[in-house]
Amino acid sequence: MELKERSMKNKKTALVLGGGGSRGAYEIGVWQALKELGIKIDMVYGTSVGAINAAMVAQGNLDLTAELWKELETDTVFDMAPDSKPTDYVKEIVVNQGAGTGPLHGLLEKYVDEKKVRESGLDFGIVAFSPADLGKHFLRLADIPEGKLVDFIMASASAFPALQAYEINGVSYIDGGYADVLPVGMAMEDGADEIIAVDLAGFGNVVKENMEKAENMVHIKSSENLGFEFIFDKQNTLRIMKLGYLDCLKAYGVLEGKEIAFAKGVFDKNTLKMADCAGDVLGIDNLLIYTEPVFMDRITEVIYDDMESQEKLAKLAGLKSLKEIREFLDNGKLKEGIKDAKAEKLLCYGAAEDIKKNGKRSIFQSRTATKLIPKIVNAAKFLVKYELI
């Protein structure tokens, strides 16, 4: 018993934070959830924006980190005027070989306390890349000279060619994502027993071998679009921070669902899948946590508001063949698949009407239809099951 307790005490948990520019706010939401879950972080590693967040995690102050992210906007990160247009940004890249990051350096000097990072007791590492010799630099605190932490974080986050390379002692560095955008390997090398990897699907090289080798890893990755990496916007920052929080709680089984967050045990496994699809297709708020009554009320409200489209519903309910479904999918702006949210809802309603009318004989119950439009079929089945249409 004593040996088991000692083993548990010595267990090391690593938080690995991927690169992805403005998407990094998602990682702060994950960290908030981990703190609420009481999961102690012993090691932290990051690339690019993940390196910035890793330094903040090492300092241990979530409120301070939130303050940093409130200040991160496109013009406070890059050397751009507040009223700059996208064409101005392109001009910066062409003329100056990337946008300057002077404002970001100033913010990091303000928020990153190197002394606290070094005294945190956490194993800490970041990744940078030097194009001159194609050098991949996996840097621990011992590798970073005193007083140079912010500089090496800047080096890790210099996403060339969008951003200018960052020079330290005559050596030019560019974004660590060129070496490893999600440095799980560093955590493994340093003896992590459990790895929590936060994947922003950012630009860079994913070392698949390390991802496959990691035996005890919680891989947290959003199914949502987290936004364009080089546009920092306060509203999107708050949105994806909440998504990170919810996705972490889902990863640890506190919440359920993929697109929508449900309180645990609200639906059985099969119904949960259908409800998740229904919530996504009907476009309900995915930043809330739903109990069954609240979810049903919201779904009902959406359907009621959409009933003005009855004529289109009647037409969709009349789809008689897979050929007609494909023609609908290929029509106009939908030729690459269903991307128009309103059209997606309409097809869902039409499918529900057809399933309600024809049961197992419905074209939407066929094996091919469930492969072609699985999300819509599941959503439609949910509406029929709960007699919502």
What are these regions (language model features)?
Residues M1-T47, A55-I389:
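Patatin-like phospholipase
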